[in-house]
């Protein structure tokens, strides 16, 4: 009798490596692995070979970097998406894409199940489960880590007993997730919010340059298209900016985060390009968007980031907000100058053909065209409701 199939989102790390053997032993399933390239910067063929050596039926490796950029990172840039105004959502943005291809590979192979290595405490379980169910309600989801309740130590023991090669040891107990948009590090000493993260956990943000320098990012309709005047595809631009900003130690985030499941967690991120691009994009929007639109957009950005963080990428609310965000970007074209110094950066210049900044109106020097005489009438009308309220006794009525 032919065994049922399961498609496992496979990273090559501890959880999913253990999950391959566990799914075979516990559920008697034929395992198909799916590994996606979203800019991890590692040899994915090695991961494919590892999966095959563990006895999987098929091992898929898909290069999804362009799709990740086009359909997930660009919408996030347009929305200045930062959960709790701190975290640029690198991991959260990748999960709906992974869910999409879990469904696709499952359908192609007639699999009844999909599986992932998310824990029962984290946000990723929600993101992938909701993504899969939004696209294929008929598929069943197995989350081995939620079921087996292994501690990190017990997982390592299981791997050793089953001859599973893993990149984690008792001396290096970190769980790392990485893509083009950012890198996250969890576990070990980092779980103590009082302890300073050891320097050796950082890979992208090491202080190598101490002399200040300037970079320039050019945007077209909200999308970065040039770095220092040189046109680049966004994959290349992000990769180069990660290196440039990261060499100043820029991009480290140490954050107490409110997880969707109700707990607080200590999260360490590296996101040099993401932080610089979003701040530059905000600065350009400040120059070209009318005040009311700019203010309202900032409010919606927080909700947008929450929806992405919560795993509601395919929700109609997120899609409706995206339509609004896209509309706001029609004039977000121009360039932004950024100064880089050790451990920090600042916006020091911005220019756009759609700039609403008018020097002749804004200047306090001689020659200003602003009509100060009009201010008296404006103030009277603007404050008319408060004036009438005060006449009727105001707060003392």
From Swiss-Prot:
Positions annotated to bind L-aspartate: 119, 123-124
CDD domains: ASS (cd01999)
Binding site for ATP: 9-17, 117
Protein name: Argininosuccinate synthase
Pfam families: Arginosuc_syn_C, Arginosuc_synth
Keyword Transmembrane helix: no
UniProt KW keywords: Amino-acid biosynthesis, Arginine biosynthesis, ATP-binding, Cytoplasm, Ligase, Nucleotide-binding
GO biological process: argininosuccinate metabolic process; L-arginine biosynthetic process; urea cycle
Originating organism: Dictyoglomus turgidum (strain DSM 6724 / Z-1310)
One function term, GO molecular function aspect: argininosuccinate synthase activity
InterPro entries: Arginosuc_syn_C, Arginosuc_syn_N, Arginosuc_synth, Arginosuc_synth_CS, Arginosuc_synth_type_1_subfam, AS_cat/multimer_dom_body, Rossmann-like_a/b/a_fold
């Amino acid at each position: 009798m032919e065994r049922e199939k399961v498609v496992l989102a496979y990273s090559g790390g501890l959880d999913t490596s253990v999950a391959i053997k566990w799914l075979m032993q516990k559920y008697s399933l034929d395992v198909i692995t799916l590994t996606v390239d979203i800019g991890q910067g590692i040899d994915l063929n090695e991961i494919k070979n590892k999966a095959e050596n563990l006895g999987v039926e098929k091992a898929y490796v898909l290069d999804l970097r362009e799709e990740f950029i086009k359909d997930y990172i660009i919408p996030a840039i347009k929305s200045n998406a930062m959960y709790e105004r701190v975290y640029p959502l690198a991991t959260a943005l990748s999960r709906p894409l992974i869910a999409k291809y879990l469904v696709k590979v499952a359908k192609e192979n007639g699999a009844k199940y999909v599986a992932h290595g998310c824990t029962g405490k984290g946000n990723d379980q929600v993101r992938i489960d909701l993504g899969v169910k939004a696209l294929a309600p008929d598929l069943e989801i197995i989350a081995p880590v939620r079921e087996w309740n292994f501690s990190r130590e017990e997982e390592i023991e299981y791997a050793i007993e089953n001859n599973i090669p893993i990149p984690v040891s008792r001396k290096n107990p970190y769980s790392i997730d990485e893509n083009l948009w950012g890198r996250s590090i969890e576990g070990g000493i980092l779980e103590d919010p009082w302890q300073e993260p050891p320097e050796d956990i950082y890979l992208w943000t090491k202080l190598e340059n101490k002399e200040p320098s300037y970079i320039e990012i050019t945007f077209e309709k909200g999308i970065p298209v040039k770095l220092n005047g040189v046109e680049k595809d966004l994959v290349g631009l992000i990769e180069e900016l990660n290196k440039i900003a990261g060499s100043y130690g820029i991009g480290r985030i140490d954050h107490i985060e409110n997880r969707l499941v109700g707990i607080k967690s200590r999260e360490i991120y590296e996101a040099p390009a993401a932080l610089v691009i979003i701040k530059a994009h905000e600065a350009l929007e400040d120059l070209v968007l009318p005040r009311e639109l700019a203010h309202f957009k900032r409010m919606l950005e927080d909700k947008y980031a929450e929806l992405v963080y919560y795993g509601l990428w395919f929700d109609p609310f997120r899609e409706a907000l995206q339509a609004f965000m896209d509309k706001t970007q029609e004039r977000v074209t121009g360039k932004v100058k950024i100064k880089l110094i050790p451990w920090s950066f600042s916006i020091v210049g911005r220019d756009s053909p759609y700039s609403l900044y008018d020097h002749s109106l804004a200047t306090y020097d001689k020659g200003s065209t602003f009509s100060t005489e009009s201010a008296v009438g404006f103030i009277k009308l603007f404050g008319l409701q408060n004036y009438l309220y005060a006449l009727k006794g105001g707060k003392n009525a």
